[in-house]
Swiss-Prot record:
Location in the cell: Mitochondrion
Family (UniProt): Belongs to the mitochondrion-specific ribosomal protein mS26 family.
Domain of life: Eukaryota
Cellular component, GO, one term: mitochondrial small ribosomal subunit
PANTHER family: 28S RIBOSOMAL PROTEIN S26, MITOCHONDRIAL, SMALL RIBOSOMAL SUBUNIT PROTEIN MS26
Subunit structure comment from the entry: Component of the mitochondrial ribosome small subunit (28S) which comprises a 12S rRNA and about 30 distinct proteins.
Organism: Rattus norvegicus (Rat)
Pfam families, alphabetized: MRP-S26
Transit peptide range per the UniProt entry: 1-27
Subcellular location, principal: mitochondrion
Keywords from the named record: Acetylation, Mitochondrion, Ribonucleoprotein, Ribosomal protein, Transit peptide
Protein name in the entry: Small ribosomal subunit protein mS26
Length: 200
């Protein structure tokens, strides 16, 4: 652009050319202070209706999805036509090979699925049998624990019954007092540090 302006401003007679620059309004740099009329101005964004914004956003999204799908469809169509035009018989042969390979892979997949299903059924049967055995063992152990608990409680009851025979009640209080008074036992004794019994 400067070269064109220099040609326009060339002077005859060997005088140096002068630039003809149009007076344009320049932009302020980021370091320049704001204008006096803009010092107290607060920039307020325009009001946006939330419902309208939601509708516009949804419509833009649908539009982009539609355009993307159309672009993908057209791209696939153009690529398919170019492939057919360039390859021809080779493309058809490759397509047949791909179909045959797909059929072989599907047959192998079905066979593998059948084999894995048989293994899965056998594993589930073994797990069910093991679970039944564990449940039977748990039930047997629980029955043994209950039986042991019942026996323990029976022994405790028998022990309490035996101890109850020696309990002092209102009925045998007088007899026990007489028996204690008539008893020749003496509890007036002590044990030394050496283990000797000292009686008075």
């Amino acid at each position: 652009m400067l070269r064109a302006l220099n040609r326009l401003a060339a002077r005859p007679g060997g005088q140096p050319p002068t630039l003809l620059l149009l007076p344009v309004r320049g932009r302020k740099t980021r370091h320049d202070p704001p204008a006096k009329s803009k010092v107290g101005r607060v920039k307020m964004p325009p009001a946006v209706d939330p419902a309208e914004l939601f509708v516009l956003t949804e419509r833009y999204r649908q539009y982009r999805e539609t355009v993307r799908a159309l672009r993908r469809e057209f791209t696939l169509e153009v690529r398919g036509k170019l492939h057919e035009a360039r390859a021809g018989v080779l493309a058809e042969r490759k397509a047949q090979e791909a179909i045959r390979e797909h059929q072989e892979l599907m047959a192998w997949n079905r066979e593998e699925n059948r084999r894995l299903q048989e293994l899965r059924i056998a594993r589930l049967q073994l797990e069910a049998q093991a679970q039944e055995l564990r449940q039977a063992e748990v039930q047997a152990q629980r029955a043994q624990e209950e039986q042991a608990w019942v026996q323990l409680k029976e022994q405790e009851v028998l022990k309490l019954q035996e101890e109850a025979k020696n309990f002092i009640t209102r009925e045998n209080l007088e007899a026990r007092i007489e028996e204690a008074l008539d008893s020749p036992k003496s509890y007036n004794w002590a044990v030394t540090k050496e283990g000797q019994v000292v009686r008075n």
